[in-house]
């Protein structure tokens, strides 16, 4: 830091140059984030200074959070005061960490606990293991890349405190058999956390026969991310427990704040994300989100149909707006797409394929351009 400060104009010019080096979402096909909705940005700016880590100072923002949790609860069929059973987090990673922390605290009688989850689970659970020392056991996947239930059962023992199921896997967008995982959790008397960070704002607005939420008796907690398909600003995540007592397992005494209890992982917590999520959910409503999801699925179909004309199949039939294209030498294709045409795509691990996420910023015209460039790369 220099002795003398810069002018406002100098700073803004520097920031403009820095921003110009960032990728533009128009050619980003790999991210689960997107441009936030205009009303979300306005709300975020209006509440920029609010700190949910000290809610006694910001009762208006705290009330907005309760209303958001109530909307989450209705969407996820929660039955027991959702506004008292969760909070808005920084995103899926924090939500997953806190869900497992709650399991651990609730079952403090087990000295060497383990948790069973799919191989497809998000890397945030590896952070859980690193932070807590809890053993993470990963069940294999079936041919459709859903978690294999026999594998899950084989990994459960007397020290297993919980299971994890994924409603919209990060790599393939696949849906685990949550109904069957719920039955196993009930049978074994253990927790079941559902990571619906991506699918949580997609599945409720699709016409599919799939139950993954609090309608299932065995589901004890859920992750849902508004800053993905809900078009909220970053950071905006959500964590909801079936019962307030599971949420209360996260309680920490805070003697020098305006309230004497805190449940979040972070101390300081953005109220701007709360306001942003409230604003966009209220503005779009169910009909608005149905259109967002319908549009994304329509573009997804256009991508799949266009790829087939190039002789490229998908690894699995897309369930959500995530597509894995089975191309030879996927890593090389990815590199050429970026270096020669500026497209940002990612690679799935097993099998290795081109991973494309059709977020709301991706339009039909975008896919047409991408397919033309993909055809040049693979010829």
Curated annotation (Swiss-Prot):
Pfam families: Pyridoxal_deC
EC number from the UniProt entry: 4.1.1.11, 4.1.1.25
Catalytic reaction equation(s): L-tyrosine + H(+) = tyramine + CO2; L-aspartate + H(+) = beta-alanine + CO2
GO MF: aspartate 1-decarboxylase activity; pyridoxal phosphate binding; tyrosine decarboxylase activity
Modified residues (N6-(pyridoxal phosphate)lysine): 228
Stored SUPFAM superfamilies: PLP-dependent transferases
Keywords linked to the UniProt accession: Decarboxylase, Lyase, Pyridoxal phosphate
GO BP, sorted A to Z: carboxylic acid metabolic process; coenzyme A biosynthetic process; methanofuran biosynthetic process
Recorded metabolic or biological pathway in which this protein acts: Cofactor biosynthesis; methanofuran biosynthesis; Cofactor biosynthesis; coenzyme A biosynthesis
The protein's enzyme class: lyase
Cofactors demanded by this protein: pyridoxal 5'-phosphate
Family: Belongs to the group II decarboxylase family. MfnA subfamily.
Role of this protein: Catalyzes the decarboxylation of L-tyrosine to produce tyramine for methanofuran biosynthesis. Can also catalyze the decarboxylation of L-aspartate to produce beta-alanine for coenzyme A (CoA) biosynthesis.
Name listed for the protein in its UniProt record: Probable L-tyrosine/L-aspartate decarboxylase
Protein source organism: Methanococcoides burtonii (strain DSM 6242 / NBRC 107633 / OCM 468 / ACE-M)
